[in-house]
UniProtKB/Swiss-Prot annotation:
Region forming the signal peptide: 1-28
Keyword Protease: yes
Lineage, top ranks: Bacteria, Bacillati, Actinomycetota, Actinomycetes, Mycobacteriales
Enzyme Commission no: 3.4.16.-
UniProt xrefs under Pfam families: Peptidase_S13, Rv3627c_N
Disruption phenotype annotation: Essential, it cannot be deleted.
Region (Disordered): 39-64
Name of this chain's protein: Carboxypeptidase DacB
Native source species: Mycolicibacterium smegmatis (strain ATCC 700084 / mc(2)155)
MF (Gene Ontology): serine-type carboxypeptidase activity
Length: 460
């Protein structure tokens, strides 16, 4: 079959149709383009960039300073609370260092754990923030099979298995020491513990032995597990009465040696070959944990680091002397300080509000930049550490929450606070408050006293 032949009229009709289609497409395109152009011209201009008030702003150094009279008037009602017992204190301007209020600031008082402010300050003045403590295992050169766990002052070492939590963040592990020993191919038959880094008594004057079972302290030895806790992740865990021996037993068990055969070497071992070592977390991290939890064992061990750096014995007396020496070296008045430990646990300690406030003021001021981290290490009212559950029960307390930071101190009849607060006018103040012979609501009373500083403009 031949293909169908188009007639001339058919070609003309198709041509006209194509032309009409092209015209329609062009017209539609023009119409669309015109409408799009009109729409573009109708778009409103872009709005100005959004702005927001920053959540954190520098303090206003031009904010009015409270007057002595204004502060005294504002504090009067809170000071009248009989549950404060004997109350001493000092308040100063953080920027100028000017004293704004004081009451018995030079009277020696029982400080409790607020004493840790001094220990922390001395550590910051003396040691590198990244300083670590090393625990080693040494093989005896003349006694095959004998290894010695040599304590270097790390009280945070843990026997917890790998991958499990420990009380202390970044703690070194007994399991790592055991792995290193095995990697050396040494057949271990005996384990001993060298505790010679520390000297003197293991318990300070004024410590109650019952506080070991109460979970507040352990005998101070140069190596221990989880700060001497018998239950490593339990807040109220009782402490061991033989922490160094426990550490040695843990290493022995990890190496397949009978734990009950472990003995101490109080005078240390001469010579030997180091076959394993682990290191603690950096100093700044240990200070943070110590201040947040008010950890007595950590405070004592860190003070002994200061003593070692100054060439003093790592003992209670050596540590206290080293801490006070470093504070005096930067102009802190320690004349009223009579201390027998570095944690504040002893009932025999005496300290003045003047000394405490001078330390905090030096940290908040401009003259001692090495002390500045102390401000960040203070617990936050209503937010962290030993102040996490305080300042939340009253309007005045809630108003101070987040604005006030302080180290706490608590013993029977004693409550203390030393820290920093921004008042209602934006002025930064430092303070130290110590209450002895306090009544049953003494802690609440001292919190209320410090909270006044936040609500106070006190410029008149």
């Amino acid at each position: 079959m031949r293909p169908t032949r188009w007639r001339r009229s058919t070609h003309v009709a198709v041509g006209v149709a194509v032309l009409a289609l092209v015209v329609a497409v062009v017209a539609a395109a023009a119409l669309f383009t015109g409408k799009h152009s009109d729409a573009a011209e109708a778009v409103p201009p872009a709005p100005p960039p959004a702005t927001a008030d920053p959540g954190v702003v520098p303090v206003d150094l031009s904010a009015p300073t409270p007057t002595r009279r204004g502060l005294a008037t504002a504090l009067a009602a809170a000071l009248a609370n009989p549950d404060l017992g004997l109350i001493t204190g000092r308040i100063t301007d953080a920027d100028t260092g000017a004293e704004l209020w004081e009451q018995g600031a030079r009277v020696p008082m029982q400080p409790a754990s607020v004493n840790k402010v001094l220990t922390t300050a001395a550590a910051l003045l003396t040691l590198d923030r990244d300083a670590r403590l090393t625990t080693t295992v040494v093989a005896a050169d003349d006694q095959p099979g004998l290894v010695v766990l040599r304590g270097g002052g790390d009280t945070t070492l843990s026997a917890a298995p790998k991958g499990t939590d420990t009380w202390y963040k970044g703690a070194a592990r007994i399991s790592d020491l055991a792995d290193q020993v095995r990697a050396r191919g040494i057949r271990v038959t005996r384990v001993r513990v060298d505790t010679s880094a520390y000297s003197g008594p293991t318990m300070a004057p004024g410590w109650d032995p019952a506080d070991i079972d109460g979970g507040d302290i352990a005998p101070m030895e140069s190596v221990m597990l989880d700060g001497g806790r018998t239950q490593p992740t339990t807040v109220e865990s009782r402490r061991s009465k033989s922490p160094a021996l426990d550490a040695g037993k843990a290493l022995a068990a990890a190496l397949g040696v009978e734990p009950e055969s472990v003995t101490l070497m109080p005078s240390g071992m001469r010579g030997g070959t180091t076959i394993a070592e682990v290191q603690s977390a950096p100093l700044i991290e240990r200070l943070r944990q110590m201040m947040n939890e008010s950890d007595n064992v950590m405070a004592e061990s860190i003070a002994r680091e200061v003593a070692e750096a100054l060439g003093r014995p790592q003992s209670f007396e050596g540590a206290v002397g080293a801490v006070l020496t470093q504070l005096r070296s930067v102009g802190i008045d320690t004349s009223g300080a009579k201390l027998v430990d570095s944690s504040g646990l002893s009932v025999d300690n005496r300290l003045t509000a003047l000394t405490l406030d001078e330390v905090v003021n030096a940290a908040a001021g401009h003259t001692q930049p090495a002390l500045r981290p102390l401000v960040d290490l203070l617990p936050i009212a209503g937010g962290s550490g030993t102040l996490s559950n305080r300042y939340l029960d009253t309007d005045a307390g809630r108003a101070a929450a987040g604005w006030l930071r302080a180290k706490t101190g608590s013993l029977t009849g004693t409550n203390a606070l030393a820290g920093i607060v921004t008042d209602r006018s934006g002025r930064v103040l430092t303070f130290a408050l110590i209450s002895n012979n306090a009544g049953p609501t003494g802690r609440t009373a001292i919190d209320a006293l410090a909270a006044v500083l936040r609500s106070c403009g006190c410029g008149a």
